[in-house]
Amino acid sequence: MIEKSTPAPITHAADADLIGPDKSLLIVDDDTAFLRRLARAMEARGFAVEIAESVAEGIAKAKTRPPKHAVIDLRLGDGSGLDVIEAIRGRRDDTRMIVLTGYGNIATAVNAVKLGALDYLAKPADADDILAALIQRPGERVEPPENPMSADRVRWEHIQRVYEMCERNVSETARRLNMHRRTLQRILAKRAPK
Protein backbone atom coordinates (compact mmCIF):
# COMPACT_ATOMS: atom_id res chain seq x y z
CA MET A 1 0.00 0.00 0.00
CA ILE A 2 1.00 3.59 -0.34
CA GLU A 3 2.63 4.98 2.73
CA LYS A 4 2.96 8.55 3.79
CA SER A 5 6.72 8.66 3.99
CA THR A 6 9.50 10.97 3.03
CA PRO A 7 9.76 11.32 -0.72
CA ALA A 8 12.23 9.13 -2.52
CA PRO A 9 14.95 11.36 -3.90
CA ILE A 10 15.40 11.52 -7.64
CA THR A 11 19.01 10.51 -7.93
CA HIS A 12 19.79 11.07 -11.60
CA ALA A 13 19.61 14.38 -13.45
CA ALA A 14 18.12 12.52 -16.42
CA ASP A 15 15.26 11.30 -14.20
CA ALA A 16 14.53 14.88 -13.15
CA ASP A 17 14.51 15.82 -16.84
CA LEU A 18 11.90 13.13 -17.53
CA ILE A 19 9.60 14.68 -14.93
CA GLY A 20 10.45 18.05 -16.41
CA PRO A 21 8.95 21.43 -15.63
CA ASP A 22 5.36 20.26 -16.18
CA LYS A 23 4.65 18.28 -13.03
CA SER A 24 0.90 17.90 -13.62
CA LEU A 25 -0.41 14.48 -12.59
CA LEU A 26 -3.97 13.18 -12.95
CA ILE A 27 -4.85 10.19 -10.75
CA VAL A 28 -8.09 8.37 -11.60
CA ASP A 29 -9.27 5.69 -9.15
CA ASP A 30 -12.63 4.83 -7.58
CA ASP A 31 -11.05 3.61 -4.33
CA THR A 32 -11.25 6.90 -2.42
CA ALA A 33 -8.86 5.94 0.40
CA PHE A 34 -6.22 4.65 -2.03
CA LEU A 35 -6.71 7.69 -4.28
CA ARG A 36 -6.15 10.18 -1.46
CA ARG A 37 -3.10 8.34 -0.07
CA LEU A 38 -1.54 8.15 -3.52
CA ALA A 39 -2.30 11.82 -4.20
CA ARG A 40 -0.56 12.87 -0.95
CA ALA A 41 2.42 10.62 -1.67
CA MET A 42 2.83 11.95 -5.22
CA GLU A 43 2.47 15.57 -4.05
CA ALA A 44 5.28 14.84 -1.57
CA ARG A 45 7.37 13.70 -4.54
CA GLY A 46 6.89 17.02 -6.33
CA PHE A 47 3.84 16.50 -8.55
CA ALA A 48 0.91 18.92 -8.93
CA VAL A 49 -1.88 16.39 -8.44
CA GLU A 50 -5.48 16.42 -9.64
CA ILE A 51 -7.78 13.53 -8.75
CA ALA A 52 -10.84 11.96 -10.33
CA GLU A 53 -13.02 9.15 -8.97
CA SER A 54 -14.74 8.08 -12.19
CA VAL A 55 -14.26 7.71 -15.94
CA ALA A 56 -16.54 10.70 -16.58
CA GLU A 57 -14.64 12.91 -14.13
CA GLY A 58 -11.28 11.72 -15.49
CA ILE A 59 -12.29 12.47 -19.10
CA ALA A 60 -13.62 15.91 -18.10
CA LYS A 61 -10.35 16.79 -16.33
CA ALA A 62 -8.31 15.42 -19.25
CA LYS A 63 -10.23 17.64 -21.66
CA THR A 64 -9.96 20.73 -19.45
CA ARG A 65 -6.26 20.39 -18.60
CA PRO A 66 -4.50 17.42 -20.21
CA PRO A 67 -1.83 16.28 -17.72
CA LYS A 68 1.83 15.52 -18.41
CA HIS A 69 1.54 12.42 -16.17
CA ALA A 70 -1.40 10.13 -15.35
CA VAL A 71 -2.04 7.14 -13.10
CA ILE A 72 -5.29 5.43 -14.06
CA ASP A 73 -7.13 2.51 -12.49
CA LEU A 74 -8.32 0.14 -15.20
CA ARG A 75 -11.67 -0.85 -13.70
CA LEU A 76 -13.77 2.04 -12.47
CA GLY A 77 -17.37 2.08 -11.27
CA ASP A 78 -18.67 3.77 -14.42
CA GLY A 79 -16.48 2.09 -17.04
CA SER A 80 -12.93 1.40 -18.16
CA GLY A 81 -9.85 3.47 -17.47
CA LEU A 82 -8.91 2.80 -21.11
CA ASP A 83 -11.47 5.48 -22.04
CA VAL A 84 -9.58 8.00 -19.91
CA ILE A 85 -6.31 6.99 -21.60
CA GLU A 86 -7.88 7.59 -25.02
CA ALA A 87 -9.23 10.98 -23.92
CA ILE A 88 -5.82 12.07 -22.64
CA ARG A 89 -3.99 10.77 -25.70
CA GLY A 90 -6.48 12.62 -27.92
CA ARG A 91 -5.53 15.92 -26.26
CA ARG A 92 -1.86 15.43 -25.50
CA ASP A 93 0.46 12.87 -27.05
CA ASP A 94 3.39 13.31 -24.65
CA THR A 95 1.52 12.27 -21.48
CA ARG A 96 3.31 9.59 -19.49
CA MET A 97 0.57 7.19 -18.30
CA ILE A 98 0.58 4.23 -15.92
CA VAL A 99 -2.35 1.82 -15.58
CA LEU A 100 -3.13 0.33 -12.15
CA THR A 101 -5.45 -2.55 -11.46
CA GLY A 102 -6.18 -5.17 -8.87
CA TYR A 103 -7.89 -7.32 -11.49
CA GLY A 104 -5.60 -7.48 -14.45
CA ASN A 105 -5.03 -9.69 -17.41
CA ILE A 106 -2.72 -9.80 -20.37
CA ALA A 107 -5.28 -8.58 -22.92
CA THR A 108 -6.08 -5.40 -21.01
CA ALA A 109 -2.40 -4.73 -20.37
CA VAL A 110 -1.73 -4.99 -24.11
CA ASN A 111 -4.68 -2.67 -24.86
CA ALA A 112 -3.45 -0.12 -22.32
CA VAL A 113 0.05 -0.10 -23.81
CA LYS A 114 -1.33 0.13 -27.36
CA LEU A 115 -3.36 3.17 -26.30
CA GLY A 116 -0.24 4.83 -24.94
CA ALA A 117 0.33 3.70 -21.35
CA LEU A 118 3.99 3.29 -20.39
CA ASP A 119 3.42 0.47 -17.96
CA TYR A 120 0.86 -1.66 -16.18
CA LEU A 121 1.19 -2.11 -12.41
CA ALA A 122 -0.79 -4.42 -10.16
CA LYS A 123 -2.43 -3.03 -7.04
CA PRO A 124 -1.35 -2.47 -4.43
CA ALA A 125 1.49 -0.50 -6.00
CA ASP A 126 3.40 1.89 -3.80
CA ALA A 127 4.30 5.46 -4.68
CA ASP A 128 7.95 4.60 -5.34
CA ASP A 129 6.99 1.94 -7.91
CA ILE A 130 4.63 4.39 -9.59
CA LEU A 131 7.27 7.14 -9.60
CA ALA A 132 9.83 4.74 -11.09
CA ALA A 133 7.37 3.76 -13.82
CA LEU A 134 6.49 7.40 -14.58
CA ILE A 135 10.12 8.51 -14.94
CA GLN A 136 11.49 5.48 -16.76
CA ARG A 137 13.37 6.27 -19.92
CA PRO A 138 11.88 5.22 -23.28
CA GLY A 139 12.57 1.54 -23.85
CA GLU A 140 13.50 0.98 -20.20
CA ARG A 141 11.40 -1.39 -18.11
CA VAL A 142 10.79 -1.36 -14.38
CA GLU A 143 12.15 -4.54 -12.79
CA PRO A 144 9.45 -7.24 -12.83
CA PRO A 145 8.58 -9.03 -9.59
CA GLU A 146 10.86 -11.90 -8.66
CA ASN A 147 8.07 -14.45 -8.36
CA PRO A 148 6.94 -15.72 -11.78
CA MET A 149 3.27 -16.42 -12.50
CA SER A 150 1.95 -19.78 -11.43
CA ALA A 151 0.30 -22.13 -13.93
CA ASP A 152 -3.05 -21.30 -12.31
CA ARG A 153 -2.45 -17.58 -12.85
CA VAL A 154 -1.46 -18.13 -16.50
CA ARG A 155 -4.63 -20.20 -17.03
CA TRP A 156 -6.76 -17.51 -15.35
CA GLU A 157 -5.24 -14.75 -17.49
CA HIS A 158 -5.87 -16.81 -20.65
CA ILE A 159 -9.51 -17.26 -19.63
CA GLN A 160 -9.77 -13.52 -18.94
CA ARG A 161 -8.22 -12.65 -22.30
CA VAL A 162 -10.66 -14.86 -24.21
CA TYR A 163 -13.55 -13.58 -22.06
CA GLU A 164 -12.64 -9.97 -22.96
CA MET A 165 -12.23 -10.90 -26.66
CA CYS A 166 -15.75 -12.36 -26.56
CA GLU A 167 -17.01 -9.10 -25.04
CA ARG A 168 -17.73 -10.84 -21.71
CA ASN A 169 -20.12 -13.36 -23.31
CA VAL A 170 -19.91 -16.50 -21.15
CA SER A 171 -21.40 -18.90 -23.72
CA GLU A 172 -19.07 -17.79 -26.53
CA THR A 173 -16.06 -17.81 -24.20
CA ALA A 174 -16.88 -21.36 -23.05
CA ARG A 175 -17.15 -22.51 -26.69
CA ARG A 176 -13.77 -20.97 -27.58
CA LEU A 177 -12.13 -22.47 -24.50
CA ASN A 178 -13.75 -25.86 -25.17
CA MET A 179 -15.27 -26.05 -21.69
CA HIS A 180 -18.77 -26.30 -20.30
CA ARG A 181 -20.52 -22.98 -19.72
CA ARG A 182 -21.26 -23.78 -16.06
CA THR A 183 -17.63 -24.67 -15.43
CA LEU A 184 -16.61 -21.30 -16.81
CA GLN A 185 -19.25 -19.54 -14.70
CA ARG A 186 -17.90 -21.23 -11.55
CA ILE A 187 -14.34 -20.20 -12.43
CA LEU A 188 -15.40 -16.60 -13.07
CA ALA A 189 -17.46 -16.46 -9.86
CA LYS A 190 -14.63 -17.91 -7.79
CA ARG A 191 -12.03 -15.43 -9.08
CA ALA A 192 -14.24 -12.32 -9.33
CA PRO A 193 -13.09 -9.36 -7.24
CA LYS A 194 -15.03 -8.88 -4.03
Swiss-Prot record:
PROSITE patterns, alphabetically?
RESPONSE_REGULATORY
How does it get modified after it is made? Answer: Phosphorylated by ActS.
The protein's UniProt keywords, in alphabetical order, are:
DNA-binding, Phosphoprotein, Transcription, Transcription regulation, Two-component regulatory system
Q: Which residues carry this modification: 4-aspartylphosphate?
A: 73
For this protein, the record's Pfam families field holds: Response_reg (PF00072)
**Family matches, as SUPFAM superfamilies:** CheY-like
Q: Which residues form the signal peptide?
A: none
Q: Please name the CDD domains in this protein's record.
A: REC_RegA-like (cd17563)
Cystine connections: none
Record has Transcription as a keyword: yes
Record's superkingdom?
Bacteria
Return one GO MF term: DNA binding
Every copy of the Response regulatory domain together lies at 24-138
For the keyword DNA-binding, the answer is yes
Q: Which GO terms describe its biological process?
A: phosphorelay signal transduction system
PANTHER family named in the record: PROTEIN PILG, STRESS RESPONSE REGULATOR PROTEIN 1
Protein function? Member of the two-component regulatory system ActS/ActR acting in acid tolerance. These data implicate that a two-component sensor may be involved in pH sensing and/or response.
Q: What is this protein called?
A: Acid tolerance regulatory protein ActR
Organism source for this protein? Sinorhizobium medicae (strain WSM419)
